Each structure stands twice: as C-alpha cells, then as structure tokens.
Amino acid sequence: MKSSWQVTDNDVTEVRALADVCGIDRLIASILYGRGIRTPRSVSDFLEPCVSDLHSPFLLNGMHDAVARLRRALDSGEKIAIFSDSDIDGITSLTIIHDLLKKLKSPAYTRYPRDREGYGLTREIVDEFRDRGITLVITVDCGIRDIAEIGYARGCGIDFIVTDHHEPDTELPAAILINPRLEKSSYPFRDLAGVGVAFKFAHAMLWSYQLSYNVRFVIISSSDGGFYYTFVRNGIVTVNDPLENSSVEWFVSSILLPSDHVVLAGCGDEVRELVSSRGLPGVSDLFRLANKFMKKDYRSHDECIKGLAPLFRLRAFPGVRDHDMSVRVFLELQLRSSDRVFGLLREYIPLVAVGTIADIMPVRGENRQMISYGIAVLNSGMGHAGLREITGSARVSSRSISWDIAPLLNTPGRMGLTDLAVEFFLTEDIERTRELIGQISELNRERKKIVSGTIEKIKTESAGMESDDGFFYFADDSIKDGLAGLIANRIADDIKKPVIIMSGPDLNGHIKGSARSYGRYNFLSHVEPLSEMFERLGGHAQAFGFTFRKENIETVMQSIARSVGKGNPRDDTIRIDALLDHSAIDSQLIERLSLLEPYGRDNEEPLFLSTNISVGSFQRFGTDLNHGKYIIGSNIQAIGWHMAEIMYDFSSSGRELDIVYKLENNRYQNRLYPRMVIIDIDYSD
C-alpha cells in the first residue's frame, strides 16, 4: 500500500538537459537519471554498449598463468578434463571451454555432479580423473572452496585451473585461480557469472594465439590542438596522457621501446617521419588498420572515425576527446583483427547471456554489455544452434530468457538428469537437439507439478513460516536436492524472509541444503562464521548451498537461528520510477521503453504510478479464476496475476484508484496492445 510506495524525485531541469544532449525520450531520461545514470557518457554506455567496453580478460588475476599452463598441456598432449557445476551457469561455462578445446584439437573429458553425488568436487571424482590419466582439470563455475579435494588431486599429479565467481574463503586452493571476487583481484567488475569468467578465459586463450599477444601498442594522435599518447597491451590501457608539442621528439626518441608498435591517429608527416626513424617493427595509421580489418577504403583519419563511430556505437559527447575516440576505435579494431576469433566470441556470447541471467547476476556494467550483445546475436539468427531451435522466430529478450529458456534448461539438473542438459548444449546433431527439447519440455512440466505440490506440503506441515524467527527452514528426504533452491526462493518471496530447504542424505550420508535470502539481506554473512559445522558451504550473499552430516541438523539450524536473530530487517519499499498519466500509454511508448532492456537484478523493469484512475470493468480469468483484469479508458487492459480478489474489492467500491504497474505490449493477431501489469493498488486520496 501507499505507505511503502517511494516515487523517485528527479531534478526536472537536469532530466530535460540530459534528454536533449543525448537525444532520448524524456521519460527514459528520467528513469535513467533516477537510477544514477546522469552523464551523457554513462547514458551512452548504458543504452548503446560497445564490444570494446568489455574489460580485457588479462585484467583477471591468474589469467596469464592459466593461459601458459593450458597451452603447455595442449603442446605436450596432456589429457584435460573440465569439471562444472550442474546448473545452467555451470553448463554454459562447460560448453564454452569444451568447444574451445575441441577447436584447439584437444577434446576434453567432461564431468559434473550427478544426482545424489553431493555438492562440488569429491575425492571419488578426483580418483576418476587420475584413473583416466588426466593431468590438468579446468573447473568452471566451481572449485574456489574445494581446497581439500584439490590438495588431494595435487598429490595425484593433477593440476587445476579454477575459474569461478563464488565467494572465496580465507584459505584458497593450491591452483591457478581466476575469480573476480578474490581479495586482491584488480578486475574492475566483480559480479561476473561463472560463464562470464569462462568466457574471459576462452577469450584470453584465443588472444594468446594472435600476433598482437603481449605486444605494446602506442597510439599517438594529433587532436584538440595538441598531441596525446596511449599505451595498450592485450587490450589494457595503461597510460593515457597529453604531450607538449616540444616533447614529441623526446617521447619518440626516449620513451618508445624497440619492440613497440605505433598507431598514428591523425598525425602529420613530421611525426610520422620521427616515428619511422626509430626502425620499429610496426608503424601504421589507424585508418589503414581500419581498411585492413573492416575491409573499408578510408582515405583519412577523420573519414575513418566518422565512418566507424556509428558502426561501433561510439558517440562523441562534451568532454570526450578526439584521442579517446581514436583509442576506442583501435580497441574495436583489435578485437576484430581475426575473423576466426571474433566469430568464436560471437558464438559464445549468447551462452554468456543465458548463463548470466539464469544465475540471477546483476544486469549492470559488463554483465549488461555481454547480455545485450548475446541477445542481439541470437536475434540475428546466429549463436548456439540449440538456443536458436528453442526460440524459433520469436524475439529473444531478457524476460524470455529468465521466464522461459533458463527455467526450461535448468530443469534436467534440478531433476537429477544433468546429462540431458549437457547433451543439449554439446550435441551438433539438430535432430537429436529437437528430441532433447521435447524430453526436457516434458520434464519441465513434471518439475512444475512437483514444485507446486512440495510448496503446498510445506505450507500445510509448517507452523514456523509466519513466526517472527529470522529465517524459516524445512527438511524432507523426498525433496530433490536440485529443486531445493527453487522451492526456497518461491517461499522466501512469499513469506518475505530467508529460507533454507534441505533434501535427504546423499551417497555419503550428508544433508544438502539450499538457502535463499529475501531482498538484499546478506544471509551468507550470518552463516559463514559457522563454517566449521559444515562439510561444504559456498555461494553468494543471497543464495548459497551447503552440506553437513544428517545427525547435526538440529544443532546447525539452532546455530543459524542464533546468528540471524529475530526479525531480520527487510525492505518492502516499492520504488517507483515515474508518475505517468495513463492516457499517455500506447504501444509506441512501450516500444521506446525497450531501450532500457535487458532487465534483471539491479536493472529491474521500470515501475510507474498512475493516480485517480476510474476502472471501467473488472473480469476474472485463468484456470482457477485467480487472475484479474481491469479495462481502463477506451483500450488499456490492466492485469493482476493472482490478484483477482483484491482487484474485485477495490473495483467494487466505485472509488478512483492509484495503481503501481509495469508496462508491456501484448501481441494478438499480429497487433500490439498496451497492457499494464499491476504491482500494487490503493484508493486515491
């Protein structure tokens, strides 16, 4: 109700100025401004993410060591295995590294936890690797807390490259580690999904085979009335400074190294002659590189920048130097310098989009860039063949991935049949792909019934759901461990507090639990101090898993209860992006709002508030008639999922209503109809 509504209060003058400078709709500018995106550059980065904005994979700690170790294994013919988590983040990660190794002529043995095997790497799996003669294991979306198991593997002569994104413990495994969450990580974005980390490793490996690997490029430009230079190595910009005119000769003679490759951006003949006199291995003009890699015929630097900026989605805003544009064009060209490498990255990035959304990672920063690009690739008819088979001709969006594709493909792992999902992603037989989609779809229908039935059972058997305890837990041997997290998440959303759901003992007599928080409450921070009570514990602040001996269940739950305390703080505020006159709603407005996609965690669909609404009619619909629909004005539907009763009560009063809602277009018979999706209702003042 209104007590929990919070409408964003923006500076109207600044919003108008931002909209005018960026050439965007004022409503979109207002939403962005309210979410802290308030400069032309940040608006451009958000609405038009560029491939060159992705951080270099070599900024990740351990990346050079990982590349060197894998290349040594490939050169010497070592047997390599990939070990992944069994969810979609893990399986998409496995798919990328498996395909990479296949293309590098070294097919890998793949392994992941199977039904009732428990959580993560085990000694039994290590023994399996040893017996197969494997000497290098690459973990994807897991491994950062498998300290004892990796230590055991090292004693068996097996090395590990751990690519993971889960929270590390204070002790780390004896392996090459690639994880943006490491305490000493210098990587600019810590919220990559597991598949994002795997993608970075694949990119680094592909880069290492290019002639540009470990070469320092020096971009020198004459722009804005002066000279500028930038050092770039492996996509990392290390120095970006101006030069006084008088110091250009000194710079060329004293700072340039004999191994440097120089790229000139709009420089005159005098600078070219100075640089050429050094006898460097490479000196080229930026526009000539563009002609080579983009198959263009530019005759000058200015013509090159003018032609490539829109192609690369680069925009010049106040405060952006011409030199900075030249550097960004160079980074784009370097990424595209190999058709084979760029083609593989385009092939892999839809997998990153699906895995990142499926793991509910923040849709901001680099994640947003990769998701945007991955969805664009799928909508162009390219990318993973199985994903294209699922989507067909329908437009792919973050919503279709999170509501349809990810739940479907997560089903086999949740039901203890991970092999089906792995085969779906790895097979190259399109007929087999179609068979698998049919099997997985049937399994998904079964999964929905089981989850609904289990939730009803828990509600019936549990009295503690409505108590003021800081969290709720439930254990049942019949619950499939793969469904525990999904059930916990649904119940947490319902009762608005953290939930733990535990399944029966695995092959080693361990209880396996999945914990889900509510809102932004850091549940893991209250459980992590109790780590000695668990066989395994790991994950994220709001979603984590664990195992412990079955006989310890009461002791463990009591300890968590003491740590969490009573009634942990929660935020029920509904944050509204903008007030909107409902008469302004049409399908064109909703289409313009799609610029804000992809949506997800930390970039939720915008919420609007319309006041003093007169409801024309009310109708129930759905199998159980538990959904409601208002007709507002002449043609706008306002639907409320599972809100039939409350909508009836409000409409039958005859009073005007204030409604908080999302907007969507409903397609019917090839026409778009605007629709409000109700979040909350109250009487108008």
Residue ranges and their predicted role:
Residues N635-S651:
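Beta-strand/loop nucleic-acid-binding surfaces
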Residues K2, V12, L18-L136, C156, ...:
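Hydrophobic helix-and-loop "lid/oligomerization" segment in the mid-to-C-terminal part
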Residues I176-L182, L280-L308:
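Short alpha-helix plus adjacent loop in nuclease-associated cores
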Residues A578-G640:
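Accessory interdomain/linker segments of ATP-dependent helicases and helicase-like nucleic-acid enzymes
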Residues N552-Q558, I646, S653-D685:
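OB-fold single-stranded nucleic acid-binding module
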Residues G225, F618-D624, W641-M643, E664-P674:
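Single-stranded nucleic-acid-binding OB-fold domains
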Residues V239-K296, G319-F330:
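Conserved DEDDh/DEDDy metal-dependent 3′-5′ exonuclease domain
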Residues G194-A198, A204, V275, E303-L345, ...:
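Acidic, Mg2+-coordinating catalytic module of metal-dependent nucleases/exonucleases
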